[in-house]
Design a protein with these regions (language model features):
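A conserved acidic beta->alpha catalytic loop
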Residues: 12-13, 26-29, 36-50, 57-60, ...
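Active-site beta-to-alpha loop of glycosyltransferases that engages the nucleotide-sugar donor
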Residues: 7-21, 40-41
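Hydrophobic targeting segments
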Residues: 2-7, 23, 33-37
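Conserved catalytic core of nucleotide-sugar-dependent glycosyltransferases
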Residues: 87, 108-188
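Short, acidic, metal-binding catalytic loop of nucleotide-sugar glycosyltransferases
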Residues: 18-32
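Active-site-proximal specificity loops/subdomain of glycosyltransferases
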Residues: 44-95
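C-terminal catalytic/acceptor-binding lobe
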Residues: 166-168, 176-177, 181-242
Length: 242
């Protein structure tokens, strides 16, 4: 068995180094390779081996600040294309699984093993995000539609377990059979929901795949620069997952 870990990456050097540290420290039961599309981020190449990345250069702007990240349709189009290229690389490379991990997520060492032990074609690890500074954190999963929850889901997902969900993404382990069935991140022409993870989730369920969320080892989401600074001040990776 072999696994490919990867993502499109448009990230600061500081956060990317912490991200790589968390990937390096994953418990790995088999061959695990990694590959990243460095999206307008050529400086990050110095932290990778030559066979671990390709540069992806585009002209569109992407803005983020302490409030939120400002996504435009063109940003989503690029990310969708790069995620689909990672699917192609998974299939052509003979990998059994692809694990997508967004580049601002810090993973517990047992994340990969736990997701494999779930024995599901599609299973994600939970993380919680304040999309606006004054909001309550919400998870990287939902029950219905764009981002709708059943009444008890938020409280339920705070407890360690494995839960069937309606959609998920960003930190997700996917078996190659899902891709062989034709599931990908491309938008659906008759669905207006925003985001490639929603397109993937809808395509997966249309192909009779269930989506699962593991909550045993929540990832840490460094969504803002201030959250990265707090993470470092509190002891970084070692303190977060000791």
């Amino acid at each position: 068995m072999k696994i490919l870990i990867g993502a499109p990456v448009r990230q600061s050097e500081e956060v990317f180094k912490e991200y790589l540290k968390s990937l390096d420290n994953l418990e790995k039961p088999c061959q695990v390779d990694r590959f990243f599309y460095l999206h307008n981020s050529p400086k990050l190449a110095e932290y990778l081996e030559p066979n671990e990345y390709a540069n992806a250069t585009t002209k569109e702007e992407y803005k983020k600040d302490e409030n939120t990240h400002y996504w435009k349709s063109v940003n989503l189009q690029v990310v969708t294309c790069l995620k689909n290229e990672l699917i192609k690389r998974t299939l052509e490379g003979g990998y059994d699984y692809f694990m997508l991990v967004d580049s601002d997520l810090m993973l517990h060492p047992k994340t990969l093993i736990t997701l494999l032990e779930a024995d599901k074609p599609i299973v994600a690890e939970v993380f919680w995000t304040k999309w606006q500074p004054d909001e309550e954190p919400t998870p990287n999963a939902w029950d219905l539609d764009h981002f709708t929850f059943y009444q008890d889901s938020i409280d339920k997902w705070k407890n360690p377990g494995l839960y069937k969900v309606g959609g998920t993404g960003a930190c997700i382990l996917i078996h190659r059979s899902v891709f062989e069935a034709g599931v990908n991140y491309s938008p659906l022409y008759n669905v207006s929901f925003w985001g490639e993870d929603r397109s993937f989730s809808i395509r997966a369920t249309a192909h009779n795949y269930e989506l699962w969320l593991d909550t045993h080892y929540p990832a840490v989401h460094l969504y803002r620069e201030s959250e990265y600074q707090k993470y470092v001040e509190n002891g970084g990776y070692e303190a977060a997952f000791s």
